[in-house]
Amino acid sequence: MIEENKHFEKKMQEYDASQIQVLEGLEAVRMRPGMYIGSTAKEGLHHLVWEIVDNSIDEALAGFASHIKVFIEADNSITVVDDGRGIPVDIQAKTGRPAVETVFTVLHAGGKFGGGGYKVSGGLHGVGSSVVNALSTQLDVRVYKNGQIHYQEFKRGAVVADLEIIGTTDVTGTTVHFTPDPEIFTETTQFDYSVLAKRIQELAFLNRGLKISITDKRSGMEQEEHFHYEGGIGSYVEFLNDKKDVIFETPIYTDGELEGIAVEVAMQYTTSYQETVMSFANNIHTHEGGTHEQGFRAALTRVINDYAKKNKILKENEDNLTGEDVREGLTAVISVKHPNPQFEGQTKTKLGNSEVVKITNRLFSEAFQRFLLENPQVARKIVEKGILASKARIAAKRAREVTRKKSGLEISNLPGKLADCSSNDANQNELFIVEGDSAGGSAKSGRNREFQAILPIRGKILNVEKATMDKILANEEIRSLFTAMGTGFGADFDVSKARYQKLVIMTDADVDGAHIRTLLLTLIYRFMRPVLEAGYVYIAQPPIYGVKVGSEIKEYIQPGIDQEDQLKTALEKYSIGRSKPTVQRYKGLGEMDDHQLWETTMDPENRLMARVTVDDAAEADKVFDMLMGDRVEPRRDFIEENAVYSTLDI
């Protein structure tokens, strides 16, 4: 025992300064890249591009750049070109090195700190250039400034050679070229053109008049897009409403500046029942909203009510319209430019500056009041839409109260057809929404009763894209789902109260099954989106074929692009000697017994499930409206354009 204590004492004495590791320069970034770019997966890889593009956008925000070009090179490296002033090349006092070298080799170096470089910056932390350098096998920068072309190259963050002049020029700007390091990005170093193009288009909308393009030079993937919107966020609203019926043609656009904070709002009403409000702060999409949205919402509600009362559209003794009423069918984009944005929330995408509430409120109120006075016909349409929404809300409230009395939107009154699980651990619990009573019966028998619950639904549920709130709440199947999930509804919705953290849609592998799946996804997207954003929603992948030898099923074939190849391979595999394999086609879940359903579709050890995510809310909104909304023409166009890829289930 004494010997052990002596040994312990010796170990303690050895813990001295020599044991402390100091990470020099950009070594810390390479050691812990996730701290700087979020992850080393696909999202983090694309974040490298945004760090460099954001620097060019900063030049545009400051009024010095008008054209940005992004290239995915043939070798999958990235080049970003802008026509700004060019990164400074003179000696930086603190480091004694050229400023451009400092920007790419020293963390927190750049024109974004201290207010001397940029009035407003798109960057969250100003470490972008050096982080990209640290996480690239090679990076080079060309600065076009003062009639000269300055060039410097780096490898994994380290300087290869001093800054040099390699030519003359009559233009200004900066060109950055980098190759992501596969030692860091072990999952993939392949850039996704569509991911880059969507964000680049968004930046073009948010920066009126800016020209920004993306070009893919990779073999077999060559494509190019140019974005330029003189209408700015007004054009963005038109883009979002492209497939919708609008109640007035030209979006309302307002802009203003107060206390150094610039506010832009564009909005337009549609005939739909859904609200689409997107907000941005310094070009960063604030998915979680924030103080700019608060100010906008409060002003919108107050101004519409004031106008309605003053013009006798609403009587003095009538209740005011609520925020929910005046936002029904609204599509709006809010963009603020703030010299010192504060971001908070779970994903740091919520604007927290308290002063922005009153500034947005005041600037938007003044402009919106003026618009309503100058456009009385449009103003009346807006108010009347709000009044209709109010009537539907009151009817929905009555329906909700009746529903609570009859079957309850309360957890204590779970729907009768729900076969619940015994576990109370939401983290492991799974709710399967199953098409039809027959399959529901098999699923109930075959499941693991400890953590798997079954909710059968009959037929096609209501298309919520075309329905008012009172009709939605009157639908028994929809009510059952909300009650089973335990999350509440509407303003009371709380994803933290979800009783299951896997919500699995399990429908037949035919056209009807696909339709039911789409209806359920529409419902979840419109009224349970936090469940979707939390990653709780899955689609079961039941087999489409079973390969039998005699009476025994040897292999199941899952649906997918290569399903016919899988089937062909399986048939060849089991065509041995005299045995002749046969194919069983599963059109419905009810064609499988409980054991088969468990083995192929529900057993966590064997099953395949597709998780449903929302990477692009604006695009998702447009697609749901096109597929499920009132307008037939966009849906017909989509079917005609994509029919060649469809499989008919006859």
UniProtKB/Swiss-Prot annotation:
<dbReference type="InterPro" id="IPR018522">
    <property type="entry name" value="TopoIIA_CS"/>
</dbReference>
<feature type="site" description="Interaction with DNA">
    <location>
        <position position="460"/>
    </location>
</feature>
<keyword id="KW-0479">Metal-binding</keyword>
<dbReference type="GO" id="GO:0003677">
    <property type="term" value="F:DNA binding"/>
</dbReference>
<dbReference type="InterPro" id="IPR000565">
    <property type="entry name" value="Topo_IIA_B"/>
</dbReference>
<protein>
    <recommendedName>
        <fullName>DNA gyrase subunit B</fullName>
        <ecNumber>5.6.2.2</ecNumber>
    </recommendedName>
</protein>
<feature type="binding site">
    <location>
        <position position="435"/>
    </location>
    <ligand>
        <name>Mg(2+) 1</name>
    </ligand>
</feature>
<dbReference type="GO" id="GO:0046872">
    <property type="term" value="F:metal ion binding"/>
</dbReference>
<dbReference type="GO" id="GO:0005737">
    <property type="term" value="C:cytoplasm"/>
</dbReference>
<keyword id="KW-0238">DNA-binding</keyword>
<dbReference type="InterPro" id="IPR034160">
    <property type="entry name" value="TOPRIM_GyrB"/>
</dbReference>
<feature type="domain" description="Toprim">
    <location>
        <begin position="429"/>
        <end position="543"/>
    </location>
</feature>
<feature type="binding site">
    <location>
        <position position="510"/>
    </location>
    <ligand>
        <name>Mg(2+) 2</name>
    </ligand>
</feature>
<keyword id="KW-0413">Isomerase</keyword>
<dbReference type="InterPro" id="IPR001241">
    <property type="entry name" value="Topo_IIA"/>
</dbReference>
<dbReference type="GO" id="GO:0006261">
    <property type="term" value="P:DNA-templated DNA replication"/>
</dbReference>
<dbReference type="GO" id="GO:0034335">
    <property type="term" value="F:DNA negative supercoiling activity"/>
</dbReference>
<dbReference type="GO" id="GO:0005524">
    <property type="term" value="F:ATP binding"/>
</dbReference>
<keyword id="KW-0460">Magnesium</keyword>
<dbReference type="InterPro" id="IPR013506">
    <property type="entry name" value="Topo_IIA_bsu_dom2"/>
</dbReference>
<dbReference type="Pfam" id="PF00204">
    <property type="entry name" value="DNA_gyraseB"/>
</dbReference>
<comment type="similarity">
    <text>Belongs to the type II topoisomerase GyrB family.</text>
</comment>
<keyword id="KW-0067">ATP-binding</keyword>
<dbReference type="InterPro" id="IPR020568">
    <property type="entry name" value="Ribosomal_Su5_D2-typ_SF"/>
</dbReference>
<dbReference type="Pfam" id="PF02518">
    <property type="entry name" value="HATPase_c"/>
</dbReference>
<dbReference type="GO" id="GO:0006265">
    <property type="term" value="P:DNA topological change"/>
</dbReference>
<dbReference type="InterPro" id="IPR006171">
    <property type="entry name" value="TOPRIM_dom"/>
</dbReference>
<dbReference type="Pfam" id="PF00986">
    <property type="entry name" value="DNA_gyraseB_C"/>
</dbReference>
<keyword id="KW-0963">Cytoplasm</keyword>
<dbReference type="InterPro" id="IPR002288">
    <property type="entry name" value="DNA_gyrase_B_C"/>
</dbReference>
<comment type="function">
    <text>A type II topoisomerase that negatively supercoils closed circular double-stranded (ds) DNA in an ATP-dependent manner to modulate DNA topology and maintain chromosomes in an underwound state. Negative supercoiling favors strand separation, and DNA replication, transcription, recombination and repair, all of which involve strand separation. Also able to catalyze the interconversion of other topological isomers of dsDNA rings, including catenanes and knotted rings. Type II topoisomerases break and join 2 DNA strands simultaneously in an ATP-dependent manner.</text>
</comment>
<dbReference type="InterPro" id="IPR013759">
    <property type="entry name" value="Topo_IIA_B_C"/>
</dbReference>
<feature type="site" description="Interaction with DNA">
    <location>
        <position position="463"/>
    </location>
</feature>
<dbReference type="GO" id="GO:0005694">
    <property type="term" value="C:chromosome"/>
</dbReference>
<dbReference type="InterPro" id="IPR036890">
    <property type="entry name" value="HATPase_C_sf"/>
</dbReference>
<feature type="binding site">
    <location>
        <position position="508"/>
    </location>
    <ligand>
        <name>Mg(2+) 2</name>
    </ligand>
</feature>
<keyword id="KW-0547">Nucleotide-binding</keyword>
<dbReference type="InterPro" id="IPR013760">
    <property type="entry name" value="Topo_IIA-like_dom_sf"/>
</dbReference>
<feature type="binding site">
    <location>
        <position position="508"/>
    </location>
    <ligand>
        <name>Mg(2+) 1</name>
    </ligand>
</feature>
<dbReference type="Pfam" id="PF01751">
    <property type="entry name" value="Toprim"/>
</dbReference>
<dbReference type="InterPro" id="IPR011557">
    <property type="entry name" value="GyrB"/>
</dbReference>
<comment type="subunit">
    <text>Heterotetramer, composed of two GyrA and two GyrB chains. In the heterotetramer, GyrA contains the active site tyrosine that forms a transient covalent intermediate with DNA, while GyrB binds cofactors and catalyzes ATP hydrolysis.</text>
</comment>
